[in-house]
Amino acid sequence: MVSIRPDEISAILKKQIEDYDKSVSVSNVGTVLTVGDGIARVYGLQQAMAGELIEFEDGTEGIALNLEDDNVGAVLMGEGYGIQEGSTVKATGKIAAVPVGEAMLGRVVNSLGRAIDGKGEIATSETRLIESMAPGIIQRKSVHEPMQTGITAIDAMIPVGRGQRELIIGDRQTGKTAIAIDTILNQADQDMICVYVAVGQKAASVANVVEVLRERGALDYTVIVAANASEPAALQYLAPYTGATIAEYFMYKGKATLVIYDDLSKQAAAYRQMSLLLRRPPGREAYPGDVFYCHSRLLERAAKLSDAMGKGSMTALPIIETQAGDVSAYIPTNVISITDGQIFLSSDLFNSGLRPAINVGISVSRVGGAAQTKAIKKIAGTLKLELAQFDELAAFSQFASDLDASTQQQLERGKRLRELLKQPQFSPLILAEQVAIVYAGVKGLIDDVPVDKVVDFSRELREYLKSNKAEFITEIQEKKVMSPEAEAILKDAITEVVSTMVASAA
């Protein structure tokens, strides 16, 4: 028989007592009552906060949104196939946060800031809360610096400033995303960080955008946040806030940032789905009562910061898709009232061959005028009015058989101005080129050029200036002002190109 040694037993007991962990961990735990359609009802979680992250037994994360008397309504940020009735749920005590930092540049991430581009994890230790307060009144400064889009029609007539919120609105397939991508491409030498948020889009469309940006070297200063159509509604709802959070990091570091939300109609639809499943009372068009706040708190985070705050800026270009041009629907009117102007794209203009298909008559920039460069502001002052008058006359002239000479001339000039503003995709123009093109049209220097040759004239003028009048481009790009000397150089160049074209046409 094995002899029992008391000293050995006492040594084991002493060691176990010494190793005993006295710390007590208290966790707020609940039980799943029902789960389905991306929503879980949880019993317990007495101390849960609104918007708190909760963790399910299978590792799925959720957000507590409805705090009711006897249960908590949570949205799932994942498929949640492993969640069953009776599963335990743990409150994390944290609000949703995403990783931020320089390492995010050039990456494609999901709504939680996790890499989905197959390039491994993002090497950053910094995080920011997804829901952050917008800068206050004292922390802001009025918009005064231009944000060049590279699209002549916008920079000349509907200018956007750094820190502005400018809505891009139009039916499907009217070139809304194309304007946003062109704007990103034009920031290559502007020292601006871009964030492109894709909400509820086809994965193939997002892959196409990534490829375009990579080919043209724009991915180096861009972060892409993607919540595709296949993702749960909660992730589609969160994506724009994630994009704003990533841009905010750079804004508070004193950098200029640009955020594109493509598009907020799909985010509103995802929020409506979540709210209806959580049994919140529906309002107009079945959207919940706080859908306005959902967008206003997002877009108010865009700002031009004061000197004391580091002079950073966040420019927001939200995109809204309309149905059959109806800008008076609920979500479009909401976002129009929040933003500082809108660029309206018309499917009729798009189908008639005018691209970008901007309807100048109802497009407006409420604060961008203060940020426009003097060179183009001086020249383009009458451009918007002339185009609006041309549209009216064009409609009237369909019914009038004989028109007087001045009306005929106005119609002819309007046609040429229209042609001048045509611009192919992925070919943003520098300021000097825009100034030259607008000057030629507004001053009537191309009235002798046939309408079908105006696009060729625009291209040839740009090439002529680059090769023969480089001093004009240098002066406009550096000084941003049109001096009498520069105007004389430009006039000579336009006359030269026009005479060459007219001679070759004859």
Curated annotation (Swiss-Prot):
It is a peripheral membrane protein. It catalyses: ATP + H2O + 4 H(+)(in) = ADP + phosphate + 5 H(+)(out). One of its GO terms (cellular component) is proton-transporting ATP synthase complex. The keyword Glycosyltransferase does not apply. Keywords: ATP synthesis, ATP-binding, CF(1), Hydrogen ion transport, Ion transport, Membrane, Nucleotide-binding, Thylakoid, Translocase, Transport. Its EC number is 7.1.2.2. ATP binds at residues 170-177. It is found in: Cellular thylakoid membrane. It comes from the Bacteria. The record marks 363 as: Required for activity. One of its GO terms (molecular function) is ATP binding. Belongs to the ATPase alpha/beta chains family. F-type ATPases have 2 components, CF(1) - the catalytic core - and CF(0) - the membrane proton channel. CF(1) has five subunits: alpha(3), beta(3), gamma(1), delta(1), epsilon(1). CF(0) has four main subunits: a(1), b(1), b'(1) and c(9-12). Produces ATP from ADP in the presence of a proton gradient across the membrane. The alpha chain is a regulatory subunit. HAMAP family: ATP_synth_alpha_bact. This is ATP synthase subunit alpha. It comes from Synechococcus sp. (strain CC9605).
